[in-house]
Regions:
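Conserved catalytic-core motifs of GNAT/GCN5-like acyltransferases
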Residues: 124-126, 138, 143-161
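Short glycine/proline-centered loop/turn elements that form peptide/ligand docking sites
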Residues: 104, 108, 130-133, 149-156
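Glycine-rich phosphate-binding loop
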Residues: 98-101
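Terminal substrate-recognition subdomain of acyl/acetyltransferases
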Residues: 2, 9, 154-172
């Protein structure tokens, strides 16, 4: 992998939001279930990323090749008082042009390292049932809890299930 993985900071948020907009658009155009049915416009995608970065409960990483964003992943800390040890993993995306270069595991590795060093011991996520992402998570040691049928409308208009997964993270 030639991409550098870095955590988004307040100082880099605006430029990163603009850089990640094409990644979100490409991910939706490729049919992935990431909360959008139609691809957002560049402006909508940029504003969506900016709003995510403004949420104090989130930490986001971006993989870059120079100024070009190739992929991303976000950690969302649990808001409940009984969950300071856990977080949700959302929006692992890699642009189609950059897939197969080890970017997704590098992003997940950065997130897991951060989680462990910050006292988080349990990560959870949901992913489209039967997707490539589900098989990657399984390969990376994530455990399947179960599934929910007809959970989300896909970009094609079909209802698709989601699989709930978790991973225990050792404290650093």
């Amino acid at each position: 992998m030639t991409a550098a993985v870095e955590r988004v900071t307040d100082a880099s948020a605006a430029t990163t939001a603009a850089a990640l907009a094409p990644v979100l658009i490409d991910t939706v155009e490729s049919g992935a279930s990431v909360g959008w049915i139609e691809p957002p416009t560049l402006d909508e995608a940029t504003r969506w990323w900016a709003a995510l970065f403004a949420d104090a409960a989130t930490e986001t990483w971006v993989a870059r090749d120079g100024d070009r964003a190739l992929g991303t992943i976000t950690l969302v800390r649990a808001a409940k008082r009984n969950g300071p040890h856990r977080a949700e993993v959302i929006k692992l995306m890699v642009h189609r042009d950059a897939r197969g270069r080890g970017i997704a595991p590098a992003l997940m590795g950065a997130l897991e390292e951060f989680a462990a060093s910050g006292g988080l011991t349990l990560l959870v996520l949901d992913t489209e049932t039967g997707s490539l992402a589900e098989s990657l998570y399984t390969r990376w040691g994530w455990q399947t809890v179960g599934g929910i049928p007809d959970y989300a409308v896909s970009p094609s208009g079909a209802l698709g299930g989601t699989t709930i997964m978790y991973k225990r993270v050792a404290l650093a």
